[in-house]
């Protein structure tokens, strides 16, 4: 029976077949098939001493959170430990770069009466890395403004308290800079292959040396702390388990140095209720109250894409949500979020007009076949970190691709009090052009 101390996606992943997990774009995130180990985020209470052992590795974080690596066979038993309050599956992260310095009126803040430049504070980023040779991240004497760089993708010498990656100090980075690019990058081999992290840090804190002061960032006189997310794997996009450890590292560094810090997060995803109740979101809320800390997030790149639908359903009313699926779509999923107290009948219709429903409101996975598409559906039930109910629908190809055309999700109000509902598709440009909800 599904465990209500485990989030919906992890429950579904445990119940899905290996073939279903391979076809899904979500269910295997956090799982290493080579070692058969899962990375998960947990919230716990009490001492951390009893969390590890017997092939279970734990990275304790601030505030009673931790990242745990454990065998798949141990997940259910581990969740039943008294000190484990909740367990959450990692989610894949995507770029959410924002470029709004002018629109934010930052220049007037920098040049006004107070002349705020970031001097004396720390700017931290958790992203795809940084080009530490870039002039905008170097002082006038050529030395680095970066005090610490934790590259999670290079194994060797992780920071104290963590188990992955390599930490580089300002002294090591300065030595690499003095050697020049060819020799220096051998000493400190951390790179930013996508350029996303370098752009983000430039907007947040670049000093403008590369452009003679024209393209200065917001806090251009601040000192810098950088975390490059990522563990080498087939799919290079990072996960929430890496993000939460990066935030934890930055906060601990700021506390050790006794300095205020602003953290920029320009990675994200569309998964969740968008009410701030995931473990990652509650962790960010918690650490935001520690010390002198501000956490800033990007607004995303999906504002003009048809990835969200919502409305209010009245009792006895029927709503039809139309979803266009373009050709050659290998997989997709839909999250439907609503209040637990609202009872709705849910039907799904494929482009050929064949329909299933009403879906059973029961714990555990439900499986249906419509045309050449398999539907894997999970009804979420109340849990300690679930403020709203999730109905998760995975569209899996019977052969190679999900059936293209116009799908319909039909909602019928049975016993309705509030009636609000929201549907989300994955973001991060993971879907083909033409896939999305109709306006």
List PLM regions with ranges.
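Substrate-binding/access-modulating region of protease and related hydrolase catalytic domains
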Residues: 231-313, 329-345, 349-355, 364-366, ...
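Flexible, acidic/histidine-containing loops and adjacent segments that form or flank the divalent-metal
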Residues: 142, 147-184, 255, 318-327, ...
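Subtilisin-like serine protease catalytic core
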Residues: 111-241, 258-259, 330, 341-342
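Glycine-rich, phosphate-binding/catalytic loops in enzymes
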Residues: 139-145, 281, 313-315
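Protease zymogen maturation seam
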Residues: 77-122, 132-136, 156-167, 389-391, ...
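Autoinhibitory N-terminal propeptides
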Residues: 1-65, 73-114, 121-122, 135
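Ligand-binding face of N-terminal immunoglobulin V-set domains in extracellular IgSF glycoproteins
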Residues: 68
